[in-house]
Amino acid sequence: IPVLPKPLAEVVTNAYLLCRLADTIEDDVALSNQQKSEFHRRFVSVVEGSDNAESFSSALAPLLSSSVLPDEYDLVTNAAKIVRITHGFSIKEQEALIRCITLMCSGMPGFQHNKSLKGLRGLDELGAYCYVVAGVVGEMLTELFCVHCPELRGKRDEMMRLAVSFGQGLQMTNILKDIWDDRQAGTCWLPRSVFVDSDFELEQLDKLYGTEVFKIGIKKLISVSHRHLRD
C-alpha cells in the first residue's frame, strides 16, 4: 500500500480495513453462527449505506470475545469513521468495495459454519473457498487499479482472471503453511479428493501425516498452488 499513488492508496487502505472488519466478525469465538450471519448481513448494509454504522458498532462491540485483539475491537468501534471515508469515494470505487464485502460476507459463513477436521470435498470446493476469502479481494483491487490507471482498462478481463488465480495461489499457500495451526483450532481446509486411498481420513492426520498417500496429496496441492502463482 505505501508504494501506491496517494488517491489509490487511500481507497485500498479503506478496503483493507473493511475486509479486516468482516474477518473480525467471522473469527470471533464468542459469536454464534447465527450472530455472525446477522452481523455480516448488517455490515453489508452499513457499507451500502442502508444501515446505521453507529448502531451496528454498538450492537456488535459488547458481544465480542474478551480475547479479541485491541486493534480489531477498535475497528468495530470505529466502523462509522471507516465507512464515512468509504462513502466519500467515487461511485465506481464504492461499487468495487461493496461488491467485495458483499461476496465475502455472504460466502465465508457457509465454509466457516461447516468447518471440521474432515477437510473439504475436493479441489472445486477448495477453489470456491479461496475465491470468497481471497479471489474477491483480487477482483476488487483490479477494479480499483483500472479506475486509477485508465491504460489498464483494455486488459481488465484478463487481469480479473489472473486476480482470482493469484488469490487462490496465495490462499492455498496459507492453507498448506497453516495445516497444523488450523488443526489445533479444529479446522482443516485440505481437499479430501487428492488423498486417493479410501482408508485415508484427514481427521486422523496426526497419525497418517507420514504416509505416502499424504505426501503425494500434499505434493499435488503444492503443484496446483504453484501453477496459480505462476499465472
Model-derived regions: residue spans:
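Acidic catalytic motifs of isoprenoid enzymes
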Residues: 1-230
